[in-house]
């Protein structure tokens, strides 16, 4: 219960201001239902989260867009996890990927169905990673467009791009969305010590380490600017390791300044740490195996 009290009307009207600030912390994902009861009469509202103002009515946006701030072509690679999230208010939708394969000097189009008859009024998260669309018989996947009714999202598959950090965040609309950093990571562990004089000697009583990392996006295409601005305001962020969400983390600072100069490429920086009290992590190297357990260990 958020508002449970008596109100005194002014000129016969009761106004509750900043209702969005009261309800926003209660919406953990994309959508939440709230029931308002006044004088025994109730009305239920279905609220869709958006942390920024959108330049079109909610119904029009939901019918024509995925729940993402990215509206132009995106870059991806074969080892990346990609996903789209949608909410169709009134009708069931099918999701297809229109792929383009390069085979020598020929481009071969091919349509692949990813999901069918997704129910209306529900939030649907669909995996559209490029690894799911590989077709060696047709050639090398170079581009694909995700289609869901009027909604479109185009990915350009790069054979050369790499990333040094992958994060999964709840974006502007509360939907999970991955983002990839191509720049370097700058580690800046901060160690604090509490010392005391014990039996004539100075001894450390407590040593704490806060493992902070500063990550650089590298040059961004214009369409990625809004994605990383979403990351700067995100409340929930996780590390993405091999396409799997792992440790929660906290963004402590973000530099997202950019211009509209056609000759400039924006590049942002983010400072972050793991959310756990012990933020330092020791990654144990694993020796790769050549053969599985059916072979003699001598060969490994």
Region spans (language model):
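Extracellular/virion structural assembly segments
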Residues: 81-90, 98-101, 118, 128-139, ...
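Preference for solvent-exposed, low-hydrophobicity sequence contexts
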Residues: 1-160
